[in-house]
């Protein structure tokens, strides 16, 4: 085991505070409409330019182990806020720095760190209650666009694209952001459920120009295993032929004789049919087949359930108004599933999302949720250079997350004003003076985001904050973009409550841990082994080549 260095008390906190300051100072320059860019050197390729707080935080690694511990704990604030709310990472970092600074001063003055923490917790709980009470729900597409625009640093088109995407696929729908091959940013919407499996044979194509197989008002057979011969399927195939409707087969695979027979029947015109592989792998494949079954009102033919192919009847097949199959994708539009069944499945997937600890699983569950809940929209981000596209993609990701958060919990005035107003409304009292000091720490820290936004815009923070607090209306604030005072919501400067709330709770949680730290342990830097001495004995007179 390597030797460790241990620091205690004040010297530990000083080192930690220095690390917090280095990281927070780099992140906070990006806050607000006039936030500056941060350029990040990459070991390969062009440097990356970003205004995204969490991206900056993730790049910072300090040489001094103790300073690095402080920096990494604040980085945790940014990334946790990003995971929960998807935005507000810079605000969270600014709040954490303010609480840690004030808290460290109070501890140095001899106050009890645990009481300070209790005071901080009391104040945060009251502020969260206040924020939720004054939240305004958003209903219109214009309000959605406003939230998107703000989070994308004032770029109106991004806000409009996000509003349009959410209108088309619903609030639960999947909206993905990809890099475009062109200079333009565009929006593409796929309605219904789409999965990444195409037709198993080009002979299934119904539109040779576009190489697409379109099936109108189709039956859908969902089979968990491979199909290699059609003998067992003949009864159900004959029943489908009688109806004159097309049939889509989704199975683990359709191969050999089974595929050949289907193709021959299709070419002879007796059977309108197409076959695709089931999406996903392993347990996820089972779950996705079940999703399709619920969406189309069918049953998965599975030996686990004791259903054999020979005994399949028409009422076990799913139905959909339209199925469109390309070489790569299958889209099922307007499935015949019961609304109540679909809602039940959506609730079940939401519960799994809450419980899972794996980011990958969460992402896959969210994809499944969206496919059930409405559809998929893709925003393709264009730009003149790769650097510009990456920077824009960061902003669109932020804007998208903020918009989702706004739809969930509502909005409050932006520009740091909501927290500023809450700072004046804190009335909670602690059980002793040290707890009251903890409450005051939060009271002062709540002003820091508004101050930072004003400073980044090049104005005098104290004057602006004073002027905002003079007026006793909740929505009155300062537009850092134009330098005007007025009604923040009317000016379209808004923040999602979820983002502000999460930023404050995460910042206070980590800052409290830092304040109550009394010892720090880090590995001593390894001493490099001495270099090999020059020239070896007994080799005198040899010429070196």
Swiss-Prot record:
GO cellular-component term (any): cytoplasm
Keyword Glycoprotein listed: no
Name of a matching Pfam family: Cpn60_TCP1
Keywords assigned: ATP-binding, Chaperone, Cytoplasm, Isomerase, Nucleotide-binding, Plasmid, Stress response
Catalytic activity: ATP + H2O + a folded polypeptide = ADP + phosphate + an unfolded polypeptide
Primary location: cytoplasm
Subcellular location as annotated: Cytoplasm
EC number: 5.6.1.7
GO biological process terms, semicolon-separated: protein refolding
Biological function: Together with its co-chaperonin GroES, plays an essential role in assisting protein folding. The GroEL-GroES system forms a nano-cage that allows encapsulation of the non-native substrate proteins and provides a physical environment optimized to promote and accelerate protein folding.
Assembly notes: Forms a cylinder of 14 subunits composed of two heptameric rings stacked back-to-back. Interacts with the co-chaperonin GroES.
Name under which the protein is recorded: Chaperonin GroEL 4
């Amino acid at each position: 085991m390597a030797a460790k260095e241990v620091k205690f008390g004040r010297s530990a906190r000083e080192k930690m505070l220095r690390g917090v300051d280095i990281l927070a100072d780099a992140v906070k320059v990006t806050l607000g409409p006039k936030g500056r860019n941060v350029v990040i050197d990459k070991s390969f390729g062009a440097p990356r330019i970003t205004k995204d707080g969490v991206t900056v935080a993730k790049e910072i690694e300090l040489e001094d182990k103790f300073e690095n511990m402080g920096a990494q704990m604040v980085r945790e604030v940014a990334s946790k806020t990003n995971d929960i709310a998807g935005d507000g990472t810079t605000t969270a970092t600014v709040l954490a720095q303010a609480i840690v600074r004030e808290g460290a001063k109070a501890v140095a003055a001899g106050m009890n760190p645990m009481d300070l923490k209790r005071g901080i917790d009391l104040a945060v709980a009251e502020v969260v209650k206040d924020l939720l009470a004054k939240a305004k729900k958003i209903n219109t597409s214009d309000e959605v666009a406003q939230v998107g625009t703000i989070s994308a640093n004032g770029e109106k088109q991004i806000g409009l694209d996000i509003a349009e995407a959410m209108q088309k696929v619903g609030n639960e729908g999947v909206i993905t952001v990809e890099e475009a091959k062109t200079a333009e940013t565009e929006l593409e919407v796929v309605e219904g459920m789409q999965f990444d499996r195409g037709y198993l044979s080009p002979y299934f194509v119904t539109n040779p120009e576009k190489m697409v197989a379109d099936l109108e008002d189709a039956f859908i057979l969902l089979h968990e295993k491979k199909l290699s011969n059609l003998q067992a399927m003949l009864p159900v195939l004959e029943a489908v032929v009688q109806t004159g409707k097309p049939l889509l087969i989704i199975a683990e695979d359709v191969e050999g004789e089974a595929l050949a027979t289907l193709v021959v029947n299709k070419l002879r015109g007796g059977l309108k049919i197409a076959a695709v592989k089931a999406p996903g792998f392993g347990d996820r494949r089972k779950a996705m087949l079940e999703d399709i079954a619920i969406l189309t009102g069918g049953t998965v033919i599975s030996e686990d359930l004791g259903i054999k192919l020979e005994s399949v009847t028409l009422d076990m097949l799913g139905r959909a108004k339209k199925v469109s199959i390309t070489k790569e994708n299958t889209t099922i539009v307007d499935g015949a599933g019961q609304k109540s069944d679909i809602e039940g499945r959506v609730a079940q997937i939401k519960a799994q999302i809450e419980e899972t600890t794996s980011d990958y699983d969460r992402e896959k569950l969210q994809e499944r949720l969206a496919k059930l809940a409405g559809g998929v929209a893709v925003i393709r981000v264009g730009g003149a250079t790769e650097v510009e596209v990456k920077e824009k993609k960061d902003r669109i990701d932020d804007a998208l997350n903020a918009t989702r958060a706004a739809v969930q919990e509502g909005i409050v005035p932006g520009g740091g004003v909501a927290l500023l107003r809450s700072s004046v409304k804190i009335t909670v009292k602690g059980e002793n003076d040290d707890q009251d000091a903890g409450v005051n720490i939060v009271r002062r820290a709540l002003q820091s985001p508004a101050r930072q936004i004003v400073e980044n815009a090049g104005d005098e923070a104290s004057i602006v904050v004073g002027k905002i607090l003079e007026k006793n209306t909740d929505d009155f604030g300062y537009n850092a973009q134009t330098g005007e005072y007025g009604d923040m919501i009317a000016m379209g400067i808004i923040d999602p409550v979820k983002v502000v709330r999460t930023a404050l709770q995460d910042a206070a949680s980590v800052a409290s841990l830092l304040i109550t730290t009394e010892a720090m342990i880090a590995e001593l830097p390894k001493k490099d082994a001495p270099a090999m001495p020059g020239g070896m004995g007994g080799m005198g007179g040899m010429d070196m080549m």
